[in-house]
Amino acid sequence: MVKATERNGENALENQLILVDEHDREVGFCEKLETHERGLLHRAFSVFIFRKVLVDNPDGTRTFRNQLLIQKRAAGKYHSAGLWANSCCSHPRKGEETEAAAVRRLPEETGIEVTALEGFSKSCSGLQEKGAFIYKAEFDNGLTEHEFDHVFTGWLRADSSPGICKQDCNTDSLNPAEGELHFNREEAEEMKFVDVEHVMRDVLLNPDDYAAWFMPALLIATEGTEFGSLNPEASDRLIY
């Protein structure tokens, strides 16, 4: 059953979603609930917010560790409740550009404004689109996610809060000393920063703890020399 909280406010299920073909070309619009009941392919986005942690090594040197903000989906979500997912995910509205939707939705879910991201300016949101993929996932409640998912990444500036934290901070949670993150409790039960290497391992060891789109989106978000790569087994285990 769809919870009442899903029918209120900006994220009500009756909002119009953008239906697309396999090339992300618009083919129509449909209400959110009907879209998921019928498993129609629609446009979506996933945002990954990263930060750097400064670590003191035994040899006296200092290095940075990359961390990702992840969320545990709230119990009232219409699917994937209680599973871990990326920092923010949603759908652009009818007539809304995908990046603009990500800029709008990020503070609504996480409390983080794009002004806190590296590269933000009047002409740049600070979010970078890394790629896109199509996936389909059926749920026990009869709903189906079938999305053309655009993956965006952003890095918190060192002077933003929470940005770079020192080794003695609690790196598994949001540190109030750096500025508490006021995330949307209707969307997420919990939010925390985790080491990228840790989440890459854990999603392979415990895939059932994560939302269906998380692993393929993570593969795209962490492409590049700064992250290394996921275990090659990850690509073989993806189902699109």
Q: Which functions belong to the PLM regions below?
A:
Residues 49-57, 111-115, 155-161:
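Short regulatory "switch" loops immediately downstream of catalytic or recognition motifs
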Residues 21-22, 63, 176:
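Short, acidic, Ser/Thr-enriched surface-loop or helix-capping motifs
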Residues 70, 85-129:
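The catalytic Nudix box helix
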Residues 13-15, 43-45, 88, 148, ...:
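Residues that flank catalytic or metal-binding motifs in active/ligand-binding sites
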Residues 44-91:
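A glycine-rich, hydrophobic loop/mini-helix early in the fold
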Residues 1-3, 33, 82-84, 129-240:
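Nudix hydrolase/Nudix homology domain
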